[in-house]
A protein has these predicted regions:
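Surface-exposed, low-hydrophobicity beta-strand/loop segments enriched in small/polar/acidic residues
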Residues: 1-180
C-alpha cells in the first residue's frame, strides 16, 4: 500500500490578506529540474517565473550574509536558499557551495559583476519573468501544477519562504503590496 504525504511539516509559508488575493486563471506546471531532488514541497509565497515553454520555475533568491566587493569570487549568503552548483546568482555562475558553517553558505562564483551589500537580496536573473507568488503549498511529485497570485495585499514579507529582491518586487507590480 502506498501512502502519500498530504501535509508538510515545519514549512514556512507566506502570509497575506486572503480576501485581497486574486489567483491567476489556470494552473501552471512546475519545472522541477533545477530544484534540489530532496525538496518535497513548494511553499506558499515562493516567487514563480514564467519560462518560454509555459511552465513556471522558482526564481531563486538569497540574502547576502556579508558585503562582497565587485569582482569577488566568494559570496556568503544566509542558509535557506535553493541555489546549486552551476546556477547563476547576481550574474555570476556558482562553481562550489560550502555548507560547513551553521550561519551561512559560502558560494564560490565567477567574478561578481557588481558589489553586494550586507543583507542585499540577490536573484538568479529571472526576476523580470516573475508572474506571481505561489498561492498554496504543493507537493512536488514530478508533474505538479501550481497557481500563481495575480494580486495580493498586506504581504508579510518576513513570512515568505525566500527573500524577494527589488527586481522581483518590481515584476510583481503594484498589484502586490507589502505590509508596512
Amino acid at each position: 500500500m502506498f501512502y502519500k504525504e498530504k501535509f508538510p511539516e515545519n514549512i514556512q509559508e507566506g502570509v497575506w490578506d486572503e480576501k485581497s488575493c486574486v489567483r491567476r486563471q489556470c494552473g501552471y506546471v512546475i519545472d522541477e529540474t533545477d530544484l534540489p531532488s530532496e525538496k518535497k514541497w513548494l511553499e506558499k509565497g515562493a516567487p514563480l517565473a514564467i519560462k518560454e515553454d509555459g511552465k513556471v520555475k522558482v526564481c531563486k533568491t538569497a540574502k547576502a550574509y556579508e558585503a562582497a566587493v565587485k569582482s569577488a569570487t566568494e559570496l556568503k549568503v544566509y542558509k535557506g536558499h535553493l541555489f546549486a552548483v552551476n546556477d547563476k546568482v547576481a550574474g555570476s555562475t556558482i562553481s562550489a557551495i560550502d555548507t560547513s558553517n551553521n550561519d551561512y553558505d559560502k558560494l564560490t562564483i565567477s567574478a561578481l559583476a557588481e558589489k553586494a551589500d550586507k543583507d542585499a537580496v540577490l536573484d538568479d536573473g529571472d526576476a523580470a519573468k516573475v508572474i506571481g507568488l505561489n498561492y498554496a503549498t504543493v507537493y512536488l511529485d514530478g508533474m505538479q501544477s501550481c497557481t500563481p497570485t495575480l494580486q495580493a495585499y498586506e504581504i508579510e514579507e518576513e513570512t515568505l519562504p525566500y527573500p524577494l529582491s527589488d527586481a522581483v518586487k518590481v515584476a510583481l507590480t503594484s498589484r502586490h503590496a507589502f505590509k508596512i
